[in-house]
């Protein structure tokens, strides 16, 4: 087996970076779950996609730079009523970047809160259905209110 002249690792990384830059769109919308999240000025995340049997099908590092995070985080919180956190399913607008030392990562430039709201609504409906099947959904309604309360709490 004959090979062409060998490349240095940094040359190969440069070729990979150039190929990605030339052949990819400027941004992509990506569905993923936040597997880890760290705030240190910038927001560092690890995004995962899980298969049907809950094993990890894909995993990548993502960064939301401080200037973007200060815009996106309050917007997401205002729309969904919660902060970005581990376990949330999110729809992110990302730029793909490749660095010779750090490898491939995603830079977060946008977020669609309606995707997360849809996922939360689906989870809520599944929980309600499960509680109804277990017979505990209407248990509180079966309790009667006494005509004369025995205890009063003052706060």
Positions of the model-derived regions?
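Acidic, two-metal ion nucleic-acid-processing modules in DNA metabolism proteins
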Residues: 1-155
């Amino acid at each position: 087996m004959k090979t062409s002249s060998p490349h240095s690792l940094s040359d190969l990384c440069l070729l990979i970076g150039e190929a990605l830059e030339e052949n990819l769109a400027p941004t992509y919308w990506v569905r993923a779950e936040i597997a880890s999240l760290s705030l240190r000025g910038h927001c560092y995340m690890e995004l995962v996609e899980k298969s049907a049997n809950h094993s990890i099908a894909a995993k990548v590092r993502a960064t939301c730079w401080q200037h973007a995070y200060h815009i996106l985080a309050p917007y997401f919180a205002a729309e969904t009523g919660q902060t970005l956190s581990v376990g949330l399913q999110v729809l992110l607008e990302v730029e793909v970047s490749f660095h010779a030392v750090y490898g491939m990562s995603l830079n977060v430039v946008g977020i669609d809160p309606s995707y997360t709201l849809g996922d939360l609504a689906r989870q809520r409906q599944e929980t309600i259905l499960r509680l109804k099947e277990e017979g505990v959904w209407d248990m509180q309604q079966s309790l009667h209110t006494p005509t004369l309360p025995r205890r009063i709490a003052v706060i």
